[in-house]
Structure formats: C-alpha cells, structure tokens
Amino acid sequence: MNTDTEEGIFSEQWRSTTIAVMAAIGIVAYNNLAVSAALPEVGNDLGDVALLPWTISVELLTSGVAMLAVGPLIDSVGARRIFRVGVIGFILTSVLCAFAPSMLALVGARALQGVFAGLVMTVVMAAVGILYPPQTRAKVFAANATVWGVTSVAGPTIAAGLVSTVGWQGIFLMNVPVAVIAAVLAWNKMPDSDEHAERSSLDGRGIALVTAITAAALATAQGSLTLIAVGVVVTLIAAGLYIPHERRSAHPVVRITHIMSPKFRNVHLTSALVVGAGIGVHAFLPIYLRGARGLSIAAAAFSIVWMSTAWSMSAFTASRLQRRYPPEPIIFGASINAFCGTIAITLSVSAEVPIWMLFVSLFWAGSGIGAISTTGVVMLQSRVNLNEMGRINAAHQFLRTVGITYGVGLAGVIIFTTVDRRTGNVETVRELLGGEDSAVNQPVIDALAAGYSYTTFAAVLAMALAIRSARALVRDRVEPVPSAG
C-alpha cells in the first residue's frame, strides 16, 4: 500500500495521515500516564487498596488479548473500521470508569476499556507499517515519540490538577474530549481493507485459550500458593490445547512462529522485559511518594513526568540513530543504559536520598526503555511482508502488554504483601494516601517504602535478563525482508 518516497512525513502527501496517527497515539498516551497519577487518590476514595494493581493489570490483560484478536482482522478487513469501533468504545468505557462506585466496579470498567484501547493501539502500529515506506517509518515513530513527549509533560500536569481539584474521576472524563479529537482527525485516514486481502474469521476458540493462558499465568504472580498451583495447571492445559488448534486453524489468533521464530523472539523478549520492569516501578511511584515520602497529591501525581519524558526523548533520538546504525546495537546499548538507570533507582529508594536524585534516576532508566520500545517495533516491521504486518504488530504489542501486566502485577504483590505481613492489614495504606502521617503510621510508612524498594530490585533483575536477549540480537542479526515496504 505504501510507495517508496523520500518526502517528509509532514509533506503534502503524508501530512493528514501523520496527524491522524499522532492523534490516535494521543488517546493511549494520555490514558496510560493519567491513570498511574490517580492511583493514590483512587485508593483513598474507594478503599480495597489490595485491588489497586488490578486497575492497571486488568486493563493491560484485556488490551493484550484484544491486540492479538484484532491483528488478523486488520490484515483482512482493514484498520479503518476497527479504529472506529475502538475509539467509540474507548469513549463510552471512560465514562463508565469515571462513575464507578467501588474499586471492584472500577476494575470491571477498566477491563472493558482495555479491549478498546487494545484495538486503537494495534491499528495505529499496523497503520504505520502499511501506509509508510520502510525508510519513513522511523520518522513516524519519532513523531509518535513527540506525542508521548508532550503528553508526558502535559498528562501529569493535567492529572495533578484534576486530582487535586475535581478528583480522580476527572482523569477518566478527560479521556472523552481527547478521544473525540482523535476520532475526528483519524476517522477516514486509517487504511481501509485491501480488496485482494485474504479474509479472516475471528478465532473465538483461540482467543478463549489465549485469554485463559494469560489470566492463569498472571495468577501465578499473585503471591498465593493456591493461585500459583491453579495458574500453572490452567496455563499448561490451555497451552497444550492451543498448539494443535493453531496447527489446524487457517486463521489462528496468533501464529506460534510470530512469537517463537528466531528472528522475532528476542525482540519480543527484550521489549517485554524492559518495558514491563520499567512500568512496574513507574506505576506505583505516586503511591510510594505520597505514602512513604509525604508528597502532596498533586506532586505525587506529577512525579511520573520524569521517566515518561525521558522515554519519549530517547525514542525520538533512537529513530534518528536508525538512519545511520543498525537497530540491533541500538537496542543492546539501550538495554545496558536501562539496567544502569534502574540500579540508580534502587539505590535512591533504599537510601532515601533527596527526591530530586530519585527523579534523575527515573529519567536515566527511561532513556534506555524508550529507545528499545521504538527500535524494536521498527525492527520487527522490517522482518515481515506487508500481508503479515497486522499479525506481527499484534503479537508484539500483546507480548509487551503481557510483560507490563506481569511487571505491574508483581510490583503490586510485592508492595502490598510486604505491607500486609509487616502491619497485618494492607488497608492501613489508605490512611497514608489520605494524608494521615502520624507516628502511629510509621510502621506502615516503613513497610510501604520497603515494599517499593523490593520492587525496584526485581526490576533490576529483569533488566539484566534483557541485556542477555539484546546481546543475542546483535549476535544473530537478521537482514530485512525486501518486500516489507
């Protein structure tokens, strides 16, 4: 669908399409950043603090499954119709989230929201591969990184203002005008179906099995021996059923080769480890700063700006480096950078250094994560034909999302299990989030700080594993597919 051209992405040929893609990215960017900023106030208002991690994890879980499910449909029915369904659903579920009367209701609304967020994100990533020639894609991802960069500053600023004035509900309601603007700009700009494309049916059985595998695997990270045992058994059974199903199905929800093939698996693994570890630390930063370090609601909400800004800046820088260097060494260098930055975060939290030093460490780690995130997608798109673009993007986004889900889930378990075991009641965190910092709460403060410290150490281990898989990319370099453009 694309043609080779050296024109810029904001030339007359590409301008409207590029703006549409950037607008669609803006939906997901604002939502992801703002929700993390609101966690302390959500926990204080709704209670059931132990469920807080699920307000993020369940959205990631359902968005990941939606990404997989929609990949083959993009290749057959086109991205335009799927984008329209996704953006309308996202608007409606944002309203549901805003008016959730309890933590459990919010978790349910977030599960629905994740489905539609997954549709939008997969469409955007696939559209870049379909619409733009290979030499232009890095520029588009750089433009997308700019959106993330603007949102990384504007999002926390808006979130901090909303949380401290109208409450956490305002964050979800703010999704509505953002999504409406994106819908207007991108409504007719996403690629339509190719009349020669092979038609795919929805793989209902495959979706059910993948959902079971993902949910059961996530259950093993929840700390309970019963859940671990059940999760392992269900994961093995569902995986055993999916393998023969994939071989028999003409249009499986995900092809195993798109995950396990040597030319794909280390890209998936590196990205999932780095992004999952980084967001696991990032998601609970406002809770740590509000509860353990005593920052105000607004200041804690704004704290997420540092890692997300560095993430966006490094994604832009990496896209420029790709014009001169192969992607493999860029990812390897970025993985080392992310590892060193995460060590700095761990030391900053453990030693309780001044807050500004922690922010510098977060910025450092984010600079490595962002480079890997963007470069990995460009690398994958160069390794497949156009008729596989939707599937490979869906598989990658799904695995990244699984990594993030595990990162957030494990971080939540580590933090709140530490608090529960040291104080006997995890709900005591709610008092800290409400601003009660009396001497009676000192054991809770210490437990929350310790739990977050353990979380950062787990992130260091994940970053170390990512260096190994990134090194394998350099060692086993794969040449781009000529027909990828």
Q: PLM ranges: what are they?
A:
Residues 164-176, 221-228, 417-459:
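A membrane-interface helix-boundary motif in multi-pass transporters
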Residues 89-96, 178-185, 237-241, 337-347, ...:
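Transmembrane-helix signature of multi-pass solute transporters
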Residues 14-31, 35-37, 50, 58, ...:
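12-transmembrane solute porter fold
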Residues 1-13, 434-442, 470-485:
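Intrinsic disorder in cytosolic terminal tails and internal cytosolic loops
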Residues 37, 67-204:
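Helix-loop-helix hairpins in multi-pass membrane proteins, especially solute transporters
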Residues 28, 56-59, 63, 90, ...:
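Structural signature of transmembrane alpha-helices in multi-pass secondary transporters
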Residues 164-270, 277:
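Hydrophobic transmembrane-helix bundles of small-molecule transporters
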